[in-house]
Amino acid sequence: MIIKEKIFLGSFGSFVKVVVDIEREIISAGCELHVDCAEELITDGSLYVNLWGANVYPKDKKIDFISLMNIRPADNNRSMDIENPVIKKRVEDIIKKLVF
């Protein structure tokens, strides 16, 4: 499900996989795998380079930035965590704007 306006993710359960397009400031949420959410956004016009995975815990209003799709040695991200603080902050801000 692509999210372009504020929504409450509580109906998805206690844990929701999301992918954030940091350029378009939209989210895809609720997919079984982060890559499925990424495909949804790419089909909608997003570029993979702008997509970053995270996990949202709506009840606790918590975010973790762990996803296999975040491993990008070519972009200096060698971990499942988002290592670039600017990108991480952007992902966090977009999630907070659209979810919390």
Pin down the residues of each PLM region.
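Surface-exposed loop/turn and secondary-structure junction residues enriched for glycine/proline
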Residues: A29, D36, D44-G45, I66-R72
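Generic structural hydrophobic/aromatic packing signal, biased to beta-strands
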Residues: F15, V19-I22, F65, V91, ...
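Intrinsically disordered, low-complexity regulatory segments enriched in Ser/Thr/Pro
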Residues: P58-I82
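Short, well-structured alpha-helical interface segments that form or flank functional binding sites
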Residues: K17, V49, V86
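Amphipathic, interaction-prone secondary-structure segments
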Residues: L33-Y57, K62
